[in-house]
């Protein structure tokens, strides 16, 4: 029996008997003594065995390959080369007529991904390469792999399909990403840098440039951070697939590149400390304006921050949420802001914890975590029921601890009996009934009135808001699909008149999830001129549109946030042009006819007839409202129409079925009053009659209040400006008084005038000095994280104001300077975490772009989201490019920049895309001794002498069978003897189990350099 046959038999038996890594090492050492074999032949034997089994994914194969690498029997470059030779990445797309002909072909991509990720780990930890020759060999292997994946993409690409080529296969995407990270990691090693910096490897650099030219265009859809890293590598070493021109400047440039990389490599990271202020700032940023809560982004951020340390994660996010509430009370934040803080703590966090724990296999002592968090709170802010009577101060938050604990019990996080222990006294309420989303959907389907009852409960603090919102949004989606607009109208009306309910909705759903189906329904609204009654149709259309507009104006949403993807969208046209009047000669024949009919109905006839509405769809009507007002008001101002007639006609718009159109009418009217140089008396009288009508029905009153909520802020600014120009006018103040209760509708994170004045007049340098002062107080507070003390005053509005008013390029340098000073003072790790958090904290302007990195949109269906401002992270990246120059003048500042850049990228590193895996089975396999993910160095050195008596001869297949059988029997008898080293398991758990991909290592790319 030849050596390859011997080894194939050995591998086959190991796979059949599920021999673990340590036993495999022990047995293979014996066979190496009896039957030496070259590394390429050895890998051929193993991979041929895999091909014969035709198993799509066997976790033992990567373990065996990793074991052979650790034993020094095979090199990483040879592994990658052999792996490619047998990979199914070479498969061509099958024609329908050839179906079944390749049935014996083995699918290898899942194994390929894992082996390449093991190579990533080996490279990133410095285990390989040890020589320049090995680095060159690995570079060439990666180049071949990249070309193979690019070829697969091209052969599977169909321009007529939305998802074709690489994006049609999640496994190919994951393989593609892993290759890029491996290349980035290798380029950052000492040997990799030496190879790329040397003049003697021009051929390699040409081939590498060609591979990068094929890789980078595809990388845009997979990972922008990875693309940026490799793009920087391409620029640093001029890797463009062509031989560099001979120039005296080239060596200098190369030396400068090497110096830059060498400086960065010389910067050592200090200990990573998760400061108490970090999450305090992050949660404040999420909730200070429009709620910027996305579960996948939050989980990813927390996983990057805490790894697999769930207890610390839960304890610290709880502490931070209570700290944010405490700070809000001391700062006298508005009741609506306090409501959002409170709902996040009571409604969101228990549901978030329950979902997170359900997806893990880790047992977490929730009661202990909660107890630790509560012990760190300021007792004066969250008093017990008995203390409440002794305190003379504000006890607005006295019920919060109870509400939170009962919500936790409702979500089965803690038993109800533990509430008394955690409170230290008898609770003053009882356990609320927990809701289930699917049951609520069934209840609403059976009784549509149940929806309004549930919407009334969204603002309750019982932990049920998530289930209610999930049910309501699902029902709304179904109603949109079924075009059941009557029931949908009632739900939309219930939501639009409850602004705080909209806030809670965004804590659990992003705007697009809620509004995209509504916008699609409005865009495709079917209008039948022969359908009978038309007023109910206008009523239903207006109610749905009003909810969309309430969301849009409360949170200052852009069209992309609403889920609008088509330039032909009615909603988009209405938002862009609905408040602009048109000249009569710009209207087409149909619009002219409709305009005449509506003018006649409002001012000449005795009401709006069915005939008027039947000839004009709601979409056409809303686009004509501004023109209708313009023509009517002009007729009144020129004496062609009496004001009482004008007023009476406009009052028809106060009917519920037309009231939402008043948003566009009032906006146009406010613009007209502000722009006109004529006497504004008539427009002001018209505005007064619409803002404060003499009579209005009960049903219409709620809609009218929502209309004023949406328009009040802009009208107030315009009217105050007009009053400045006409100080003697007395007809403006009554309108302003009517608008005043509606001025606080928007929730966009803008600063109050008094806040802005206090920050800009800060004695230590204006707004930037105020930001530095805030930074200092947060660092000081974090130096004693266990002390039960109130947090320092903080609102993320200050940083937002700085970025919006001064620009991120002026805000970041003072933060870096403060970080440098704190580092010199010995608070470097704390200050670094805080500065990184300020940069990572979500902002409304960038939120959709950040969401797209976690849930990418289909660029064939909708436009990619764009960021309209330069962010702190953008400025940090630009500063990081100047590190070589900065290091010459200010080495400490350069070091601080490097550490901050690494920390930010580590916190925001996107999750690895590894779909199509049975995670439960993988986790179960990881816990079995036979499928360990790594073997410690000490346990690798097993004594094989005891097994030598089996006498494996070069031609004795029976000896191999017997040796395997004995090893399997021994493993079955003594499960403690598996020889697994848990250190590698711990590393993998920390890096991966938190994001649900335990078998596939998602390495932090930034930490490799």
Swiss-Prot record:
Highest taxon in the source lineage: Eukaryota
Localization of this protein: Nucleus
MF GO annotations: transcription coregulator activity
InterPro entries referenced in this protein's UniProt entry, alphabetically: Mediator_Med5_fun
Main localization, broad class: nucleus
Keywords: Activator, Nucleus, Transcription, Transcription regulation
UniProt cross-references to Pfam families, sorted A to Z: Med5 (PF08689)
GO biological process: regulation of transcription by RNA polymerase II
A single Gene Ontology CC term: mediator complex
Keyword Transcription part of the UniProt annotation: yes
Subunit organization: Component of the Mediator complex.
Role noted for this protein: Component of the Mediator complex, a coactivator involved in the regulated transcription of nearly all RNA polymerase II-dependent genes. Mediator functions as a bridge to convey information from gene-specific regulatory proteins to the basal RNA polymerase II transcription machinery. Mediator is recruited to promoters by direct interactions with regulatory proteins and serves as a scaffold for the assembly of a functional preinitiation complex with RNA polymerase II and the general transcription factors.
Family listed: Belongs to the Mediator complex subunit 5 family.
Name of the featured protein: Mediator of RNA polymerase II transcription subunit 5
Source organism phylogeny: Eukaryota, Fungi, Dikarya, Ascomycota, Pezizomycotina
Gene transcribed to yield this protein: nut1
């Amino acid at each position: 029996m030849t050596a390859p046959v011997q080894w194939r038999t050995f591998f086959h038996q190991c796979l059949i008997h599920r021999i673990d890594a340590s036993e495999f090492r022990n047995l293979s050492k014996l066979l190496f003594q009896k039957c030496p074999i070259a590394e390429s032949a050895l890998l051929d034997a193993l991979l041929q065995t895999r091909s014969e089994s035709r198993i799509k994914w066997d976790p033992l194969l990567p373990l065996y390959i990793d074991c052979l690498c650790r034993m020094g029997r095979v090199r990483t470059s040879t592994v990658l080369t052999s792996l490619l030779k047998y990979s199914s990445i070479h498969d061509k797309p099958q024609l329908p007529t050839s179906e079944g002909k390749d049935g014996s072909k083995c699918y290898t991509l899942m194994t390929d991904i894992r082996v390449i990720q093991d190579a990533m780990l080996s490279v990133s930890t410095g285990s390989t390469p040890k020589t320049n020759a090995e680095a060159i060999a690995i570079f060439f292997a990666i180049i071949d792999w990249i070309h193979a994946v690019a070829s697969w993409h091209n052969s599977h690409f169909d321009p007529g399909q939305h998802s074709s080529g690489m994006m049609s296969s999640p496994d190919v995407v994951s393989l593609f990403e892993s290759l890029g990270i491996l290349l980035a990691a290798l380029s950052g090693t000492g040997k990799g840098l030496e190879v790329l910096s040397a003049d003697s490897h021009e051929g390699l650099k040409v081939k590498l440039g060609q591979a990068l030219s094929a890789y980078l265009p595809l990388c845009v859809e997979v990972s922008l951070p990875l693309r940026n890293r490799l793009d920087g590598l391409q620029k640093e070493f001029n890797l463009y697939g062509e031989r560099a021109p001979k120039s005296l400047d080239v060596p200098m440039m190369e030396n400068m590149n090497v110096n830059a990389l060498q400086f960065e490599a010389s910067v050592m990271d200090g200990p990573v400390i998760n400061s108490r202020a970090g999450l305090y700032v992050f949660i404040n940023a999420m909730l200070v304006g429009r709620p910027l809560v996305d579960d996948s982004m939050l989980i990813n951020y927390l996983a990057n921050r805490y790894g697999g340390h769930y207890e610390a994660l839960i304890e610290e996010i709880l502490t931070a949420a209570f700290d944010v509430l405490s700070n809000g009370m001391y700062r006298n934040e508005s009741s609506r802001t306090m409501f959002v803080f409170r709902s996040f703590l009571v409604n969101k966090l228990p549901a978030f914890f329950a979902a997170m724990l359900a997806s893990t296999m880790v047992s977490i002592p929730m009661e202990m975590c909660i107890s630790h968090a509560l012990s760190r709170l300021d007792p004066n802010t969250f008093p017990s029921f008995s203390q409440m009577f002794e305190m003379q101060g504000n006890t607005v938050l006295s019920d919060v601890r109870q509400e939170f604990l009962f919500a936790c019990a409702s979500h089965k996080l803690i038993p109800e009996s533990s509430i008394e222990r955690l409170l230290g006294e008898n609770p003053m309420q009882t356990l609320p009934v927990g809701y289930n989303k699917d049951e609520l959907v069934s209840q609403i389907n059976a009784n549509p009135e149940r929806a309004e009852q549930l919407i009334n409960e969204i603002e309750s603090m019982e932990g049920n808001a998530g289930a209610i919102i999930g049910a309501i949004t699902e029902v709304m989606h179904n109603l949109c699909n079924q075009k059941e607009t009557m029931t949908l109208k009632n739900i939309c009306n219930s939501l639009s008149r409850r602004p705080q309910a909209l806030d809670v909705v965004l804590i659990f759903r992003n705007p697009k999830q809620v509004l995209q189906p509504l916008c699609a329904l409005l865009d495709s609204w079917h209008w039948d001129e022969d359908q009978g009654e038309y007023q109910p149709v206008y009523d239903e259309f207006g109610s749905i549109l009003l909810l969309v507009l309430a969301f849009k104006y409360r949170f200052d949403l852009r069209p992309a946030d609403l889920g609008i993807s088509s330039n032909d969208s009615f909603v988009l046209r209405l938002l862009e042009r609905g408040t602009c009047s048109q000249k009569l000669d710009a209207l087409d024949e149909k619009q002219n006819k409709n305009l005449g009919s509506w003018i006649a109905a409002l001012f000449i006839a005795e009401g709006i007839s069915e005939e008027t509405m039947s000839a004009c769809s709601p979409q056409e009507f809303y686009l004509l409202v501004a023109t209708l007002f313009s023509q009517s008001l002009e007729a009144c101002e020129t004496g062609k129409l009496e004001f009482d007639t004008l007023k009476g006609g406009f009052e028809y718009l106060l009917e519920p079925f037309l009231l939402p159109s008043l948003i566009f009418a009032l906006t146009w009217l406010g613009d007209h009053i502000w722009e006109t140089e004529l006497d504004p008396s008539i427009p002001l009288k018209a505005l007064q009659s619409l803002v404060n009508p003499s009579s209005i029905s009960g049903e219409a009153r709620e809609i009218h209040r929502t209309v004023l909520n949406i328009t009040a802020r802009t009208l107030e600014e315009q009217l105050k400006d007009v009053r400045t120009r006409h100080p003697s006018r007395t007809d403006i103040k009554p309108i302003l008084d009517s608008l005043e209760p509606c001025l606080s509708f928007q929730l966009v994170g803008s600063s109050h005038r008094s806040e802005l004045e206090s920050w800009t007049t800060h004695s230590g340098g204006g707004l930037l000095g105020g930001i530095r002062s805030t930074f200092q107080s947060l660092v000081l507070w974090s130096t004693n994280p266990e002390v039960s003390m109130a947090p320092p005053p903080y609102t993320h509005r200050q940083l937002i104001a700085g970025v919006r008013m001064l620009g991120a390029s002026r805000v970041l340098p003072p933060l870096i300077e403060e970080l440098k000073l704190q580092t010199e003072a010995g608070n470097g790790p704390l200050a670094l975490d805080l500065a990184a958090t300020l940069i990572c904290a979500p902002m409304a302007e960038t939120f959709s772009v950040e969401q797209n990195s976690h849930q990418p949109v289909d660029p064939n269906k909708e436009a990619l989201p764009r960021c309209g401002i330069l962010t702190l992270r953008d400025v940090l990246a630009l500063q990081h490019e100047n590190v070589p120059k900065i290091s010459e003048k200010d080495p400490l500042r350069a070091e601080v920049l490097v550490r901050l850049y690494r920390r930010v990228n580590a916190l925001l590193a996107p999750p690895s895309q590894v779909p199509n895996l049975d995670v439960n089975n993988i986790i179960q396999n990881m816990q079995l001794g036979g499928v360990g993910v790594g073997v410690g160095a000490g346990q690798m050195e097993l004594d094989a002498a005891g097994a030598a008596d089996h006498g494996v001869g070069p031609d004795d297949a029976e000896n191999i069978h017997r040796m395997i059988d004995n090893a399997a029997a021994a493993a079955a008898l003594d499960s403690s003897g598996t020889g697994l080293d848990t250190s590698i398991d711990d590393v993998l758990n920390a890096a991966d189990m938190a994001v649900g991909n335990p078998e596939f290592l998602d390495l932090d790319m930034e930490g490799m350099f």
